[in-house]
């Protein structure tokens, strides 16, 4: 799923993110940013997916949540800033 359209890696990124969040160790911040980036992008794509039209608002909220988590870790993250600007 190189384009992330099917979200095949989504459950794995969610599991790793939950594990790293539970550790509450800044050493894992770069891995958390990687997880949040994938998940934010997945939900960003899901906003426009006609098959998921009913969940568009929820997907938008989830995407914003993940991009915002990235900015909480790295306030200068340009990708997260661009994604949030594009969503709003």
Predicted regions and their residues:
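Alpha-helical junction/boundary sensor with strong preference for TPR arrays
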Residues: 20-23, 67, 74
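Residue-level recognition of tetratricopeptide repeat
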Residues: 32, 76-77
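Residue at a conserved register position within TPR or TPR-like alpha-solenoid repeats
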Residues: 36, 43-44, 50, 54, ...
């Amino acid at each position: 799923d190189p384009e992330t359209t099917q979200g095949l890696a989504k459950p794995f990124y969610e599991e790793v993110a939950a594990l790293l969040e539970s550790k509450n160790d800044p050493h894992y911040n770069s891995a958390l940013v990687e997880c949040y980036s994938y998940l934010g992008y997945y939900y960003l794509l899901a906003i426009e997916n006609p098959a998921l039209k009913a969940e568009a608002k929820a997907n938008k909220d989830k995407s914003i949540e993940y991009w915002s988590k990235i900015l909480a870790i790295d306030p200068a993250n340009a990708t997260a800033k661009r994604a949030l600007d594009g969503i709003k």
